[in-house]
């Protein structure tokens, strides 16, 4: 039995249920319970908090989160093969784990969880970025979550915390740093996973700010930033031409030289541009 709980080691679990990670679902399983406990601790004190977990797989992180004191976990798993392993965990922690077989993009966490809510997940690589952008761009702020503790490929993690002027700086950095404090909390080598991915991974911890750093409409900012970085080597007057016929006027109003390139523009200045566009 595991030291974390009275459940079998994860290698035994995946053997019993004949589980193997599927590339089509972006899966890589974490089977070291000491490591999943360490990741769970990055989410902070979970006592009195509900937790949303996406893609729990055989439940390694789930077990870590429960042992760290999560009040209740909503685990959304698309892969039906993993459900029996998760139901075993639910039986060991009565009333504290709800498992839904479905797509995280289609499920409202607030229908199942009670604030305060934290999100912790070894995100499937094929939906991780889309989920993060969605969590960072709701119309209303603060969001349903207090914090996000998320596993990404190292390259994606570096894009979230990147600063202007760096190659990694782009849409993710701007949206994350506009409304949250973001830091890389933990690095993991490929060998931590089964099967080992070709690249290293990292855990990013984001804490929601009470209000955005600068005023801006989320939808407008998101559209502007996406257009600007879609052609990041072009001058903004060219890359943003499709956003507004008067884009040079809006850039000047925001104090941004129209000849500037996207990677040189700060979060504050992108927000000023979004406000100018909103005024029309």
Curated annotation (Swiss-Prot):
Q: Where in the cell is it found?
A: Cytoplasm
Q: Write the Enzyme Commission number(s) for this entry.
A: 2.1.1.182
Q: Which UniProt keywords apply?
A: Cytoplasm, Methyltransferase, RNA-binding, rRNA processing, S-adenosyl-L-methionine, Transferase
Q: Extract one GO molecular function annotation from the record.
A: RNA binding
Give the enzyme class: transferase
What NCBIfam families does the entry give? Answer: ksgA (TIGR00755)
Q: What is this protein called?
A: Ribosomal RNA small subunit methyltransferase A
